[in-house]
Amino acid sequence: MTKDEHQSRTARSYKLILLFAMVSMTMMFAGLTSAFVVSKSRVDWLKDFQLPPAFFISTFAILASSITFHLAKKAIQKDNQKATSQWLLVTLVLGVAFVVLQFIGFGQIVAKGYYFTGPASSITTTFLYIVTVMHLLHLAGGLISLLIIIYNHFKQKYSATESLGIGLGVMYWHFLDLLWVYLFLFLYF
Protein backbone atom coordinates (compact mmCIF):
# COMPACT_ATOMS: atom_id res chain seq x y z
CA MET A 1 0.00 0.00 0.00
CA THR A 2 1.35 3.41 -0.97
CA LYS A 3 1.51 6.37 1.38
CA ASP A 4 -1.33 8.10 -0.51
CA GLU A 5 -3.55 5.01 -0.27
CA HIS A 6 -2.83 4.78 3.45
CA GLN A 7 -3.70 8.46 3.97
CA SER A 8 -6.88 8.04 1.96
CA ARG A 9 -7.98 5.04 4.04
CA THR A 10 -7.13 6.84 7.25
CA ALA A 11 -9.15 9.88 6.18
CA ARG A 12 -12.16 7.70 5.29
CA SER A 13 -11.92 5.93 8.65
CA TYR A 14 -11.81 9.17 10.63
CA LYS A 15 -14.70 10.63 8.64
CA LEU A 16 -16.77 7.48 9.20
CA ILE A 17 -16.11 7.55 12.96
CA LEU A 18 -17.12 11.21 13.08
CA LEU A 19 -20.25 10.47 11.04
CA PHE A 20 -21.26 7.71 13.48
CA ALA A 21 -20.72 10.09 16.40
CA MET A 22 -22.85 12.77 14.72
CA VAL A 23 -25.64 10.26 14.00
CA SER A 24 -25.57 9.20 17.66
CA MET A 25 -25.81 12.82 18.78
CA THR A 26 -28.65 13.42 16.35
CA MET A 27 -30.54 10.47 17.83
CA MET A 28 -30.03 11.80 21.36
CA PHE A 29 -31.34 15.24 20.44
CA ALA A 30 -34.23 13.67 18.52
CA GLY A 31 -35.17 11.88 21.73
CA LEU A 32 -34.93 15.09 23.76
CA THR A 33 -37.02 17.06 21.29
CA SER A 34 -39.58 14.24 21.13
CA ALA A 35 -39.91 14.38 24.91
CA PHE A 36 -40.25 18.16 24.62
CA VAL A 37 -43.15 17.76 22.14
CA VAL A 38 -44.92 15.23 24.36
CA SER A 39 -44.48 17.46 27.42
CA LYS A 40 -45.98 20.50 25.67
CA SER A 41 -49.44 19.03 26.24
CA ARG A 42 -49.01 19.20 30.03
CA VAL A 43 -51.19 21.68 31.88
CA ASP A 44 -48.16 23.20 33.61
CA TRP A 45 -46.41 23.97 30.31
CA LEU A 46 -45.67 27.70 29.92
CA LYS A 47 -47.56 28.79 26.80
CA ASP A 48 -46.26 32.38 26.75
CA PHE A 49 -42.57 31.60 27.33
CA GLN A 50 -40.21 33.36 24.91
CA LEU A 51 -36.56 32.69 24.20
CA PRO A 52 -34.21 35.35 25.60
CA PRO A 53 -32.70 37.94 23.24
CA ALA A 54 -29.19 36.57 23.87
CA PHE A 55 -30.19 33.27 22.22
CA PHE A 56 -30.99 35.15 19.00
CA ILE A 57 -27.61 36.91 19.04
CA SER A 58 -25.80 33.66 19.88
CA THR A 59 -27.40 32.05 16.84
CA PHE A 60 -25.79 34.66 14.60
CA ALA A 61 -22.46 34.13 16.37
CA ILE A 62 -22.46 30.39 15.77
CA LEU A 63 -23.56 30.79 12.14
CA ALA A 64 -20.77 33.31 11.56
CA SER A 65 -18.29 30.90 13.19
CA SER A 66 -19.28 28.22 10.72
CA ILE A 67 -18.46 30.57 7.87
CA THR A 68 -15.10 31.57 9.36
CA PHE A 69 -14.13 27.94 10.02
CA HIS A 70 -14.98 27.13 6.40
CA LEU A 71 -12.82 30.07 5.29
CA ALA A 72 -9.95 28.68 7.40
CA LYS A 73 -10.30 25.35 5.62
CA LYS A 74 -10.27 27.05 2.22
CA ALA A 75 -7.22 29.11 3.21
CA ILE A 76 -5.19 26.05 4.28
CA GLN A 77 -6.12 24.30 1.04
CA LYS A 78 -4.45 27.22 -0.73
CA ASP A 79 -1.48 27.02 1.68
CA ASN A 80 -2.29 30.48 3.00
CA GLN A 81 -1.02 30.03 6.55
CA LYS A 82 -1.66 33.61 7.65
CA ALA A 83 -5.31 33.64 6.55
CA THR A 84 -5.80 30.20 8.11
CA SER A 85 -4.49 31.51 11.43
CA GLN A 86 -6.75 34.54 11.30
CA TRP A 87 -9.89 32.59 10.42
CA LEU A 88 -9.22 29.93 13.05
CA LEU A 89 -8.80 32.57 15.75
CA VAL A 90 -11.96 34.41 14.64
CA THR A 91 -13.80 31.08 14.79
CA LEU A 92 -12.55 30.54 18.33
CA VAL A 93 -13.68 34.02 19.41
CA LEU A 94 -17.13 33.47 17.86
CA GLY A 95 -17.42 30.03 19.47
CA VAL A 96 -16.58 31.45 22.89
CA ALA A 97 -18.99 34.33 22.23
CA PHE A 98 -21.73 31.77 21.54
CA VAL A 99 -21.11 30.10 24.91
CA VAL A 100 -21.02 33.43 26.78
CA LEU A 101 -24.24 34.54 25.08
CA GLN A 102 -25.92 31.27 26.06
CA PHE A 103 -25.11 31.94 29.71
CA ILE A 104 -26.30 35.53 29.35
CA GLY A 105 -29.52 34.04 27.95
CA PHE A 106 -29.85 31.79 31.00
CA GLY A 107 -29.48 34.91 33.15
CA GLN A 108 -32.18 36.68 31.13
CA ILE A 109 -34.52 33.75 31.68
CA VAL A 110 -33.92 33.79 35.44
CA ALA A 111 -34.33 37.60 35.50
CA LYS A 112 -37.85 37.13 34.11
CA GLY A 113 -38.66 34.85 37.04
CA TYR A 114 -38.31 31.54 35.23
CA TYR A 115 -36.08 29.03 37.00
CA PHE A 116 -34.51 25.79 35.82
CA THR A 117 -34.71 23.85 39.09
CA GLY A 118 -36.38 24.10 42.46
CA PRO A 119 -39.91 24.91 43.55
CA ALA A 120 -40.19 27.97 41.27
CA SER A 121 -39.09 26.05 38.17
CA SER A 122 -41.29 24.81 35.35
CA ILE A 123 -41.13 21.86 33.02
CA THR A 124 -40.70 24.31 30.13
CA THR A 125 -37.54 25.93 31.48
CA THR A 126 -36.17 22.62 32.72
CA PHE A 127 -36.45 21.17 29.20
CA LEU A 128 -34.92 24.32 27.72
CA TYR A 129 -32.03 24.04 30.14
CA ILE A 130 -31.43 20.35 29.43
CA VAL A 131 -31.49 20.80 25.65
CA THR A 132 -29.25 23.88 25.59
CA VAL A 133 -26.77 22.54 28.15
CA MET A 134 -26.47 19.27 26.21
CA HIS A 135 -25.69 21.31 23.11
CA LEU A 136 -23.16 23.38 25.07
CA LEU A 137 -21.44 20.20 26.24
CA HIS A 138 -21.08 19.06 22.64
CA LEU A 139 -19.89 22.53 21.68
CA ALA A 140 -17.26 22.30 24.43
CA GLY A 141 -15.96 19.25 22.57
CA GLY A 142 -15.95 21.34 19.41
CA LEU A 143 -14.03 24.13 21.13
CA ILE A 144 -11.47 21.66 22.49
CA SER A 145 -10.97 20.20 19.02
CA LEU A 146 -10.71 23.73 17.62
CA LEU A 147 -7.99 24.54 20.17
CA ILE A 148 -6.14 21.37 19.14
CA ILE A 149 -6.49 22.38 15.48
CA ILE A 150 -5.15 25.86 16.26
CA TYR A 151 -2.24 24.35 18.20
CA ASN A 152 -1.43 21.95 15.35
CA HIS A 153 -1.73 24.76 12.82
CA PHE A 154 0.78 26.90 14.71
CA LYS A 155 3.06 23.85 14.87
CA GLN A 156 2.74 23.87 11.04
CA LYS A 157 1.15 20.43 10.83
CA TYR A 158 -1.36 21.50 8.18
CA SER A 159 -0.77 22.36 4.54
CA ALA A 160 -2.58 22.24 1.22
CA THR A 161 -1.83 18.51 1.02
CA GLU A 162 -2.42 17.69 4.71
CA SER A 163 -5.57 19.28 6.11
CA LEU A 164 -7.56 16.31 7.43
CA GLY A 165 -7.68 17.66 11.00
CA ILE A 166 -9.11 20.97 9.88
CA GLY A 167 -11.54 19.20 7.55
CA LEU A 168 -12.85 16.98 10.35
CA GLY A 169 -13.10 19.97 12.68
CA VAL A 170 -15.09 21.92 10.11
CA MET A 171 -17.38 18.95 9.54
CA TYR A 172 -18.14 18.64 13.28
CA TRP A 173 -18.49 22.40 13.71
CA HIS A 174 -21.00 22.63 10.85
CA PHE A 175 -22.92 19.78 12.47
CA LEU A 176 -23.02 21.67 15.79
CA ASP A 177 -24.18 24.80 13.98
CA LEU A 178 -26.96 23.00 12.15
CA LEU A 179 -27.94 21.27 15.38
CA TRP A 180 -28.21 24.60 17.18
CA VAL A 181 -30.28 26.14 14.36
CA TYR A 182 -32.61 23.13 14.54
CA LEU A 183 -32.86 23.41 18.35
CA PHE A 184 -33.32 27.18 18.22
CA LEU A 185 -36.12 26.96 15.65
CA PHE A 186 -37.66 24.05 17.52
CA LEU A 187 -37.64 25.98 20.80
CA TYR A 188 -38.81 29.19 19.14
CA PHE A 189 -41.82 27.70 17.40
Give the residues covered by each predicted segment.
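...captures the hydrophobic TM-helix bundle architecture rather than a specific catalytic motif
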Residues: 1-189
